[in-house]
């Protein structure tokens, strides 16, 4: 069978007219007891940034490597202190660096396996050819500086602030989803506009009007490097009914953050799978989760009553809330027409700049704030349905 397989490979070269005396066929013994297999790029395959990109699957099968069906990815900075590398990947990184020295290249595409004895097996090494050439590459040292700056920024933002909980988690999709709306690498204008219109304060003003805790002043979005993230501590605090006592608010936020830490795959589903933001018909059974997480019957009852009160008030006040929001959007529209009319008579650079500022402020005050409230009500409707 081995002989037939080798002859089949040789025939394929002939069919493709790939007749080269340098062609070779390498035979590896079958690797047993594989627990992890995958592909590692020694730099990011698109931009060539200094990260080991490990795409992997866990289990005995290695077919995911060849089929391209691997769904797990981890990125490790090339200049990271080796002691900080997760034990799971430490030996693999050592092997990769050894290969880089042998072939004198740090742009490689490597197929690998790891056995249950933590032995690294290299199946294939080839050049990484997908890196896009740019007119100006960012030096690795500059990336190191950005990482150091981001670490300092995170440490500062993670410190206890005026909100409940002594730590936070940053997510790119947990609330107001910047990853989807402005992208993972937004330009300066996109980021600043989204921050001004929504993430600086409109996001919590709308919620506070509905009876949730007012987290003023708290900016929801932060940028690390060029990527926007949502501060989940601020988000989770803003979705607690204001009537709950302070001690219980803190306990609830800590529970939410702990659950997100243990279930990071839920970061785009926090409204439905982590938080209790309104009363719905499954709430009493869902609140049972709190019993095994240190909440007393009295505390659970207080949370349930507060959510019921909040939800009833929102439903009863909805006609007025809706009417008020519509009035604000109509005011925004009328102001826009007035500004456009004034510009027709005097379209100077100064007037254009003034008009832009007026329109942005109107969008924020008369558009984004009511939208924040209505979006929250829409989420409540989705949860109840």
Predicted region positions:
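Alpha-helix N-cap recognition
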Residues: 1-2, 324
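Conserved ATP-binding module of the ATP-grasp superfamily
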Residues: 2-30, 99-100
């Amino acid at each position: 069978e081995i002989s037939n397989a080798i002859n089949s490979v040789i025939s394929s070269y002939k069919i493709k007219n790939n007749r080269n005396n340098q062609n070779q066929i390498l035979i590896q013994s079958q690797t047993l007891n594989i627990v992890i297999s995958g592909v590692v790029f020694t730099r990011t395959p698109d931009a060539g940034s200094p990260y080991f990109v490990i795409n992997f699957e866990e289990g005995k099968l290695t077919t995911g490597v060849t089929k391209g069906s691997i769904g797990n990815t981890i990125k490790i900075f090339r200049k990271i202190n080796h002691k900080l590398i997760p034990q799971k990947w430490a030996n693999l990184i050592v092997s990769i660096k050894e290969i880089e020295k042998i072939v004198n290249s740090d742009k490689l595409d490597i197929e690998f396996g790891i056995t249950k004895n933590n032995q690294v097996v290299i199946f294939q090494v080839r050049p990484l050819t997908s890196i896009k050439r740019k007119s100006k590459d960012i030096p690795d040292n500059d990336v190191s500086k950005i990482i150091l700056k981001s670490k300092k920024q995170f440490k500062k933002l993670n410190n206890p602030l005026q909100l409940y909980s002594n730590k936070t988690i940053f997510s790119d999709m947990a609330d107001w989803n910047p990853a989807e709306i402005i992208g993972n690498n937004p330009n300066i204008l996109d980021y600043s506009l989204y921050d001004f219109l929504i993430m600086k304060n409109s996001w919590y003003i709308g919620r506070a009007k509905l009876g949730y805790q007012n987290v003023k002043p708290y900016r929801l979005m932060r940028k690390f490097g060029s990527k926007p993230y949502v501060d989940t501590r601020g988000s989770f605090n803003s979705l607690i009914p204001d009537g709950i006592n302070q001690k219980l608010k803190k306990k609830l936020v800590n529970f939410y953050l702990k659950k997100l830490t243990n279930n990071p795959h839920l970061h785009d589903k926090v409204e439905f799978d982590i938080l209790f933001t309104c009363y719905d018909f499954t709430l009493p059974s869902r609140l049972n989760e709190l019993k095994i997480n240190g909440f007393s019957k009295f505390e659970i009852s207080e949370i349930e009553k507060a959510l019921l009160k909040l939800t009833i008030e929102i439903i009863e006040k909805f006609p007025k809330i809706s009417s008020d929001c519509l009035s604000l959007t109509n005011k925004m529209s009328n102001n826009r027409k007035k500004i456009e009319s004034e510009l027709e008579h005097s379209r100077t650079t100064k007037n254009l700049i003034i008009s832009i500022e007026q329109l942005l402020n109107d969008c924020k005050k008369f558009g984004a704030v009511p939208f924040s409230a209505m979006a929250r009500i829409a989420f409540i409707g989705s949860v109840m349905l």
